[in-house]
Amino acid sequence: MTKALTGVRILDFTHVQSGPTCTQLLAWFGADVIKVERPGVGDITRGQLQDIPNVDSLYFTMLNHNKRSITLDTKNPKGKEVLTELIKKCDVLVENFGPGVLDRMGFPWEKIQQINPKMIVASIKGFGPGPYEDCKVYENVAQCTGGAASTTGFRDGLPLVTGAQIGDSGTGLHLALGIVTALYQRTHSGKGQRVTAAMQDGVLNLARVKLRDQQRLAHGPLREYSQFGEGIPFGDAVPRAGNDSGGGQPGRILKCKGWETDPNAYIYFITQAPVWEKICDVIGEPTWKTDPNYAKPAARLPRLNEIFARIEQWTMTKTKFEAMEILNKDDIPCGPILSMKEIAEDQSLRATGTVVEVDHPTRGKYISVGNPIKLSDSPSDVQRSPLLGEHTDEILRSVLGFSDHQVADIHKSGALAPPQKQAAE
């Protein structure tokens, strides 16, 4: 079956996490992603956080599935010639270099457009135009500057970054959407264009409910936040609110049976108004259904600490899965806190391809995240990540059409090998 992006060729100059997240998603949908890497070195994540000596790390393998790898010294004259030919043959160039790197490489936007007017150049940067645009950004920096950290954590504690990589992977997903949108527009315009996703912008987009709450503050306290019920005044910025629900329905993380020894024996519980009476029955407080102090959502807001303490008395008598089963029967919103171990072993996630097993020639079998987006007419399969330069000759021949003699000349030029160090005199 033909995949959604079959026929689209991506020139992938990305590294670490944000860019590879984008290009891996495109590869899962069928694009031919050619990962350009430095000879002898490759993507820096090949050697980062290695759990097995002398093999590609999981950091690399889990972000570079379904790609082909070519090594190329873009400072070498012959390497520049090869890159020029690749630009002619590809639809999209994706990069997450620091500002100005493509220009210094000798391939600014204007030159790329001369070489291939239909090429889309997609970039991830830390910040958009402004006072910070030249600053280096990593995952946690993006979370801190995009509004996530200042609104995550508990009111009396430090700002916190999340375990989810919303800065890197989140921005990569934003860029992928930008690329397919530009590809669609090209079917009408016949022209390429630049696509940019800034990490600060991506994090803010994912934290939009907090920007919503910032504006609500001008009209009064945020009543669904715990501190309202505790009588603590609000300041001029959205506060950290612990595990309060962000959707207007009060919610908390509560202890379950076994919490003393199991760090993940917890459940998230939402006191949604339409099921309040069912909640009262489940926890053994039927009088709360008619008591004016508890019957209506507005009356409950100042008493949330008391209410959740009572609910927790009930959840502590059940495992998180027992509690979930009971609550789901009454459509009471909840969710167990699942550890990564539990997720890795979840057979339903295996069945849907969200968690997959991959066999790698040097590190053996490992599990990874598959495509989280399912298309009924474009199934995704997860193929192992490439070894460094594994497809160099294949790409030179099958994509660029070089003859054996031309390929040999390129090898002799040093364009595909690490630069030779000058011997000391």
Curated annotation (Swiss-Prot):
Q: Where substrate is bound, by residue? A: G247, G248, Q249
Enzyme superclass (EC): transferase
Catalyzed reactions per annotation: formyl-CoA + oxalate = oxalyl-CoA + formate
Q: What is its EC number?
A: 2.8.3.16
| Keyword NAD (UniProt) | no
User: What is its pathway?
Assistant: Metabolic intermediate degradation; oxalate degradation; CO(2) and formate from oxalate: step 1/2
Which SUPFAM superfamilies has this protein been placed in?
CoA-transferase family III (CaiB/BaiF)
A single MF term (Gene Ontology): formyl-CoA transferase activity
Give the GO terms filed under biological process for this record. oxalate catabolic process
Instruction: Name the source's superkingdom.
Output: Bacteria
Name the UniProt key words of this record, in alphabetical order.
Answer: Transferase
Q: Which InterPro entries match?
A: CoA-transferase_III_domain, CoA-Trfase_fam_III, CoA-Trfase_III_dom3_sf, CoA-Trfase_III_dom_1_sf, Formyl_CoA_transfer
Quaternary organization: Homodimer.
Q: Which family does it belong to?
A: Belongs to the CoA-transferase III family. Frc subfamily.
Q: Do you know which PANTHER family this protein is assigned to?
A: SUCCINATE--HYDROXYMETHYLGLUTARATE COA-TRANSFERASE
Instruction: Name the chain's protein.
Output: Formyl-CoA:oxalate CoA-transferase
Encoding gene (name): frc
